[in-house]
Each structure stands twice: as structure tokens, then as C-alpha cells.
Amino acid sequence: ALVYECMGSKNQTGPIFYEGFRGEFEQVSAKDNYYNHYIYQAWQHWGMAMGNPLFTGPVYNKDGRIMFANNRINAHHLGISGTPGKEWAYRLLLTYSRNWGTYDNPFDDVKKQFSSLLEVTYSPVKWNGWSFSISGAMDRGNLLGNNSGGMLVIRKTGLIK
């Protein structure tokens, strides 16, 4: 299976538009400030973004503010999965994003982030219901920093005999 997704929120409702005449601006349109609101707290749950993981949630704010400090993003995501044999499966996820902050608090420079995950699963036919997975993930960039991690999973479904 193959999936490609692209997402863009850099131009929220288009360019900034000043509504008015003769130099008097009654309203400024655009700059919607996705996931943030001036009355209620940001669209988040326990500091994490609800709906789109690419929006950097409030949990990442060093000053403790409940707001999204980065909601202007252009991103590309590629996912590939397959089963090359009866007992083997794999999954590869790759995401690249360019981040501009918010309209009110833009980043000085565009922040770039690359994230990846590779997972391989072995499900031996002779051991009904058992599977073993190993996965590794990494982030590289100047938005969230450089991080790496891994996971080993031993899973049994059904009754243990």
C-alpha cells in the first residue's frame, strides 16, 4: 500500500486584507490563526494538538502558554506498507515539513523538520497468534530537534495454549 499526503496552512484564508477605505481600516481579514482563539484556550488536549499532529502543540511551549506557536506549515508525507511473505510485514513513514510560526509571532527563519519510522513485523504461522515487531524512528530538524527512538513488541492475540 502507498499513500502520499500534502498539507498547507501557510496562507490562512489568503493574504492579509485590510477592509476599509480612505486609510481607515475597520477590519483586518485573513490570518485566521488556526487552532488558536483569543477567548478560549487552544484546540488541544493535555497540550497535544487535536486533529493534526504537525501543528506544534502547547506542550512544546517553553513559556507555558496554552497556544499553538506554529500553525503555518507546508508538509509532505509518504507512507508505504506491505507484506512480502506470509509471515513478514513492514511499514515506512516519512514526513517533511517547513514551518513559519504564526502570523502574530513568525519564526525568524523557516524551520524544517524531517520525521521517519520503519517497522518490521514477524508473525510465524507455526506460532498461531504470536507476532514480533521491531521499529525505529527519528526526527531531524530545527523545529523539534534531533531525536531517535526504538521499540520492540511481543504480541499474542487469542488464548495462550
Model-assigned labels for residue ranges:
Residues A1-K161:
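Exposed, low-structure sequence patches enriched in small/polar residues
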